[in-house]
């Protein structure tokens, strides 16, 4: 796919990667992905939104160059500095040293460490605007969606919102637009998985952002990955709100006890601990032998639990993999504040 004019003077210049199957080591991408980039041309200015992953540099530069010479781009809006968004900034600055980078102060500090050179910059404050001929760019600082440096850009006259990772997916579609997606089941599967991995740990921040997005007049949402939303925007916003609203399904305080037991001793400890907690009254206790239990179900239970105890024997002085796997899936933003401890047997 080449470039696509989304609105008069506003173009998609991203790259598609149908063959990608693993992203950032931990995410599986059965539908590939896209590295979305956009160009806005006004009467006297050119704005580039995002760059592309370094491996796509040459083809991406060719696309941008077909709209405007690289050395005539005035502004680069960096919504977020993760390398899949900013991996080509260094090369872009070599080709266009006069380029002004527009980003949050946090993002500019990160970029200085990434490119190791000076550059012109505009450190955006929340609510700040940039007037460019007949276009107004409004900036919304939205930290932790999903990095602390993130912002959205609203192109007021075009009713377009550029949202970085929010509302995106690892889903490569040749038609670029959400209205061109024929496999809706696959698209929403990829969208939910992307949300769970990228945005899910920051649900409260997403809800804050949604409150600010809903009042906007929107005809298009342009994410950093996946199809451009030219249809179904209210449904996407409602779905994100539903996914981000945490409703604890537990009617009373709940303690989860995941454990593994090589010879039964740690299992006996788990049973005794569970009985002791139960005898206190008023607390639900759920035991899971992680050799047999569904790890995904247990991970979800841990999210809503008030407390948890991890049980494991030691082999060569170490806790065992099923328990380590649970701990690496926890994050202070979602699991912080819970009562927790560990137990086990050794010898």
Please annotate each region the language model reported:
Residues 3-65, 152-155, 159-163, 266:
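Conserved beta-strand hairpin/beta-sheet module of binuclear metal-dependent hydrolase folds
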Residues 4-8, 46, 102-223, 229-231:
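Metallo-beta-lactamase
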Residues 49-51, 73-81, 101-104, 161-164, ...:
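Active-site neighborhood of phospho(di)ester-bond hydrolases with catalytic His/Asp-centered motifs
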Residues 55-102:
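Active-site metal-binding motif and surrounding structural segment of the metallo-beta-lactamase
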Residues 218-252:
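Terminal amphipathic helices with adjacent charged low-complexity linkers/tails
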Residues 268-286, 304:
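Short helix-loop-beta junction
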Residues 294-347:
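Helix-loop-strand module that forms the ligand-binding subsite of alpha/beta enzymes
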């Amino acid at each position: 796919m080449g470039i696509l004019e989304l609105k008069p003077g506003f173009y998609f210049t991203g790259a598609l990667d149908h063959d990608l199957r693993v992203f950032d080591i931990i995410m599986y991408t059965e539908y590939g992905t896209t590295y979305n980039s956009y160009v806005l041309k006004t009467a006297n200015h050119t704005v580039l939104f995002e760059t592309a992953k370094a491996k796509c540099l040459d083809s991406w530069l060719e696309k941008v160059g077909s709209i405007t010479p690289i050395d005539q781009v005035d502004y680069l809006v960096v919504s977020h500095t993760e390398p899949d968004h900013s991996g080509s900034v260094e090369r872009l600055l070599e080709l266009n040293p006069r380029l002004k980078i527009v980003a949050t102060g946090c993002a500019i500090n990160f970029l200085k460490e990434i490119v190791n050179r000076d550059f012109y910059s505009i450190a955006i404050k929340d609510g700040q605007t940039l007037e460019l001929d007949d276009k107004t760019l409004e900036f919304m600082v939205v930290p932790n969606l999903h990095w602390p440096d993130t912002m959205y850009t609203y192109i007021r006259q075009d009713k377009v919102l550029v949202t970085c990772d929010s509302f995106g997916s690892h889903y490569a579609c040749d038609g670029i637009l959400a209205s061109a997606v024929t496999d809706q089941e696959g698209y929403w599967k990829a969208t939910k998985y992307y949300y769970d991995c990228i945005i899910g740990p920051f649900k409260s921040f997403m809800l804050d952002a949604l409150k600010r997005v809903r009042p906007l007049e929107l005809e298009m949402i342009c994410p950093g990955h996946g199809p451009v939303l030219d249809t179904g925007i209210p449904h996407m916003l409602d779905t994100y709100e539903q996914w981000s609203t945490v409703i604890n399904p537990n009617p009373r305080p709940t303690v989860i006890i995941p454990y593994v037991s090589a010879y039964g001793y740690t299992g006996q400890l788990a049973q005794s601990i569970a009985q002791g907690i139960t005898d206190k009254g008023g607390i639900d206790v759920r035991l899971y032998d992680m050799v047999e239990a569904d790890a995904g179900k247990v991970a979800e239970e841990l999210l809503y639990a008030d407390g948890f105890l991890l049980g494991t024997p030691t082999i060569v002085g170490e806790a065992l993999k099923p328990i380590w796997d649970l701990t690496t899936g926890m994050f202070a933003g979602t699991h912080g504040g819970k009562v927790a401890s560990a137990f086990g047997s050794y010898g």
